[in-house]
Structure formats: structure tokens, C-alpha cells
């Protein structure tokens, strides 16, 4: 059974971190380590995390000296990771208990280096507020430029095939930038067509401001992906249209 390293950035996450950790502890796949990197929280997050660290040695806490943002937090955890498989779970999100077992088997049986899954949305009270969010069966680099089809909390990549791949140091859309970076190494990312995760959507979450997120996508195209103005405009128009269609749904 291969070791899975779970990458979890934490910042003022006292409301949700316990439930997040419990969803990992409930996994039917037991060979994992959870590396939680705290980005200078001022609430009781660390006390809660430390309590779990004492109960289970698979859970590790790293505290950053300076508030540095989620990309630095995730990269710090990736650097410390010992597992073959790198998985991502934010401190306010949850996994279903068969998540790792099903997705790792899917990757090993099909020789997949980069995978994701479908998911559902939950509110701040952990109540499901959406139907299953369906994803394409597979996506390549060019398709991903048109929309971020890959939710962070569902991703697992195989470091034995890809080596460790790190996030660009940007404030927002750093996960999107990482998926694009990985898709330059492999032909496709493949979807496990079953909801294996629960994405928490609430006012105050970084993902809730769509206009700001779109502006960061433009910045990603030009500064990270180095697209020409014409290509950036083409993909940005596609991104806005697809985002509008998803919003209307």
C-alpha cells in the first residue's frame, strides 16, 4: 500500500479544521500522512491541530514564521512530503471515507499520473447544497486554459511519475496554475466519475469572489503561462463564458 501525503494549508480554520481532519481519519485507505501547514493563524486552529497530532502520529503540523499565503503553505508541505502520491485537501473541505482507496486504485490500475474526481458543495453547516458537480472524463493543457475543471480538494498526483511539482507563488488561482504546470508534463488529467469530496462554499471563502478570481486568471495567462496577448484574450473570453454558464446552472 503506497503512502499518500495529504497537503493541507491552514489559516484561521478553527471552525472547520476538526471536521476536515476527521474526514481523513475515517479513510478506508490507512497508509497516509497529513501535513498541515499553518500560515500564522491568530485563532485556536493550532491548538485543535496539535490535539490531533498527539492522538495520531500520521498528522503533522508545521507553523510558518511569517504569513505567506496558501501557495507557500502548500509548497512547504509538498517539500516535507514522504509519500509517492500527493493529495490536496483544504482546511474547510471534506473527503468521503472511500476517497483515497478508490482514487489510488483508479490511478494504479490505469497507469494514471494525475487524477481528480467529481464532488458536491456543502455550506458552513456541512449540509449538501448542490447536486453532484460532474467533470470531464479527461482534460489536457489547452482545454484547461479555457476553464479550471479540476477542483483542488479532489486532486492526487503521482510523484514517482512526475517528481514533486510545486505551486507558483501567487495569491489566488495557484492551484489552477499548478494543474497547468502538471499538464505540461502529462497528456491528460483523468477524472474518477464519482463524488469523492465535499467542497465548502460560504461567504468569506477565497473562492466566493468570482470577479477577483477572473482577474487573477488573466494575470496567470500573461505572467505565469506567458501567453501572447491574442492567445490570452482567446482563452480569457472562453474562461468568462464557461464561468458564466456554470454560474447560471
Kindly give the residue locations of the regions a language model identified.
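Glycine-rich, basic loop-to-helix element that forms the pyrophosphate-binding segment
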Residues: 64-81, 102
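Conserved nucleotide-sugar donor-binding catalytic segment
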Residues: 79, 131-216, 220
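A conserved acidic beta->alpha catalytic loop
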Residues: 23, 30, 38-47, 66-68, ...
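Conserved donor NDP-sugar-binding/catalytic core segment of glycosyltransferases
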Residues: 98-129
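Short loop->beta transition adjacent to catalytic acidic/histidine clusters or analogous donor-positioning motifs
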Residues: 2-4, 25-36, 44, 57-60
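N-proximal low-complexity "stem/linker" segments adjacent to membrane-targeting elements
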Residues: 1-25
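Short aromatic/hydrophobic "clamp" motif used to bind/position activated sugar donors
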Residues: 86
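Acidic helix N-cap motif at the loop->helix transition within catalytic regions
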Residues: 16-18, 43-51, 94, 98
Amino acid at each position: 500500500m503506497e503512502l499518500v501525503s495529504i497537503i493541507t494549508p491552514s489559516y484561521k480554520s478553527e471552525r472547520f479544521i476538526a471536521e476536515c481532519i476527521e474526514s481523513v481519519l475515517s479513510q478506508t485507505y490507512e497508509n497516509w500522512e497529513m501535513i498541515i501547514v499553518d500560515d500564522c493563524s491568530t485563532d485556536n486552529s493550532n491548538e485543535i491541530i496539535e490535539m490531533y497530532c498527539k492522538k495520531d502520529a500520521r498528522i503533522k503540523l508545521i507553523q510558518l514564521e511569517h504569513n505567506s499565503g496558501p501557495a507557500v503553505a502548500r509548497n512547504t508541505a509538498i517539500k516535507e512530503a514522504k509519500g509517492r502520491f500527493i493529495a490536496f485537501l483544504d482546511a474547510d473541505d471534506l473527503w468521503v471515507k472511500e476517497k483515497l482507496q478508490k482514487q489510488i486504485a483508479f490511478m494504479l490500475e490505469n497507469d494514471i499520473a494525475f487524477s481528480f474526481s467529481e464532488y458536491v458543495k456543502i455550506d458552513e453547516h456541512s449540509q449538501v447544497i448542490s447536486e453532484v458537480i460532474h467533470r470531464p472524463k479527461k482534460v489536457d493543457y489547452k482545454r484547461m486554459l479555457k476553464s479550471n475543471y479540476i477542483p483542488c480538494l479532489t486532486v492526487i498526483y503521482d510523484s514517482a511519475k512526475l517528481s514533486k511539482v510545486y505551486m507558483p507563488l501567487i495569491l489566488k488561482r495557484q492551484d489552477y496554475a499548478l494543474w497547468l504546470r502538471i499538464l505540461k508534463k502529462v497528456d491528460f488529467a483523468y477524472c474518477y466519475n464519482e463524488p469523492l469530496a465535499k467542497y465548502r462554499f460560504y461567504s468569506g471563502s477565497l473562492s466566493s469572489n468570482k470577479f477577483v478570481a477572473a482577474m487573477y486568471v488573466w494575470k496567470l495567462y500573461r505572467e505565469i503561462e506567458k501567453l501572447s496577448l491574442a492567445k490570452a484574450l482567446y482563452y480569457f473570453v472562453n474562461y468568462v463564458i464557461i464561468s458564466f454558464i456554470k454560474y447560471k446552472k
